[in-house]
């Protein structure tokens, strides 16, 4: 399963590592390169540096291939906006979304 995780903090890093170990194809998006470097070094996970509320960042992260989006930034507003943007980008294609609020 392809899972897109937005937010590479403590929660996002843990969820990404766990899901990757279970055999899922995981992509993590964060505005900061530092936590993404650690995730890449410790796991077989693709990362994207950028603002996930920007549709071009979601496109770069290949949101159209994701089956699930998990938004776990520190901002509930950002998490909700990312979920809405991702669903909008997918059009009629179903996408399960989980937002930390």
Task: Kindly give the residue locations of the regions a language model identified.
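Cytosolic regulatory regions of ion transport systems
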Residues: 1-101
């Amino acid at each position: 399963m392809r899972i897109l995780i937005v937010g590479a903090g403590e929660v996002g890093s843990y969820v990404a590592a766990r899901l990757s170990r279970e055999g899922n194809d995981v992509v993590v998006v964060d505005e900061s390169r530092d936590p993404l470097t650690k995730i890449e070094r410790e796991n077989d996970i693709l990362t994207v540096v950028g603002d996930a509320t920007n549709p071009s960042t979601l496109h770069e992260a290949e949101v159209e291939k994701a089956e699930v989006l998990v938004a776990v930034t520190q901002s509930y507003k950002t998490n909700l906006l990312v979920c809405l943007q991702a669903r909008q980008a997918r059009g009629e294609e179903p996408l399960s979304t989980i937002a930390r609020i």
